[in-house]
């Protein structure tokens, strides 16, 4: 049994996540964490709301509300939505917690004492109209690399490059749109140049990093590491702990990535085992796995490892950062301003949670950008989830219920075809296990579905309803192995569709908990089945039209309200 820290990217809570955010980080991390638990590993799965920084502050200024109140309201809503999506966090916290603030300040004080932080006077944008400095998302302009017109002062969301405001072409204030002036102010910098060789060694020598994360990180390293300012002049954030830094806050991305550690500290503190976090983060045998969209790669693959190195503590380096490509909606990027896409609160009003979870993992953008379309969703729900998986389970269990008195049949005397079938199922399960281990979640679920497809072919070929008329023992042998294959199917699908897997397990009447190893064990003959009912139902094109009409009605209600926390559908 191994120890794992699993973390999903911390969402900004100026709004709720959309489907792309979910599959890029939170849902993928949940699937992996659930899989690890099924295998019997010790897992701490954490994340939290990114409460600080310019997105919240800009929005709060525009709405005339206190950023702390705004962020806390949105945090509570997002946490509830994740619960409804069956995200199995051990702790979902936020960056304004006492534990996180204390941890961050003490951490950066050590980095400062170790000599990795220096000061420099810089010209920074200032808005004379709003009388505020314009760090990060307070200033927008054209990206010098890709030409994107609304690049932010810290990063271009189009090409993913890290930026500073001086690189922007035609910068403007994000609050009022006016042209900024430049003023001199002092900031504290992390000297990444001194850590560059160690970071390069970490990236180049990491066999677990996905290709997009490794290529993006090596490209940045090839350009050379520049010192990065870790303080800001905005008020909403964690006060910087450095001498002379009064009135400065820690740049949100530098403090948010430390949340993966502070959340584990907080988790064990809540359990009354305050020192146990060290058993995870200070043990080199622990595996640390992050799940992020590709725009978050630099902060997880370069910045966080650099901070851990600069701390001088014996922190375990992240094992991998599982990064996806982008999920599009009907061929285009998600856009809140254009209301293009589906947000996770809306999704829950349209289809059951397991349907969303299955479709998103089934089309997960692991190697290239992928588009969610309603046509694809229809095909996956109807042909894969209902016809392949649900139909197979129903065929096996209904036959046992109606023809065998609802009891698991004896194993009988298997034919070569029977032995070949259950052997193939075991091989598919092992293949799915390898995909889960490699965090190839899309391939894992596709492989598990093959168990159901093989099962349907097996039933058609062996026809136990005909065998039962002339050779009861042969029919028993078929149904016993078909039933056994459902154990494999339930376990393989459990990380993705936990509710449906538990329902299937209950219908099978199995009293032992659903685990990966339990699936491999032969069923107990004579065990009574539970209530058998269809696992899924089909969705028609007319259903989709009705759902989309309903979505427009829901949005009319949402956007008639003023405040973001009032616009969420609960």
Curated annotation (Swiss-Prot):
Keywords: Aminoacyl-tRNA synthetase, ATP-binding, Cytoplasm, Ligase, Metal-binding, Nucleotide-binding, Protein biosynthesis, Zinc
Top-level EC class as recorded in UniProt: ligase
EC number in record: 6.1.1.10
Entry's Gene Ontology molecular function annotations: ATP binding; metal ion binding; methionine-tRNA ligase activity
UniProt: ATP binding residues: 336
Cofactor(s) named in the record: Zn(2+)
Keyword Zinc assigned: yes
Residues annotated for Zn(2+) binding in this entry: 143, 146, 156, 159
Catalytic activity from the UniProt record: tRNA(Met) + L-methionine + ATP = L-methionyl-tRNA(Met) + AMP + diphosphate
Protein family according to the UniProt entry: Belongs to the class-I aminoacyl-tRNA synthetase family. MetG type 1 subfamily.
Protein name: Methionine--tRNA ligase
Organism: Pyrobaculum arsenaticum (strain DSM 13514 / JCM 11321 / PZ6)
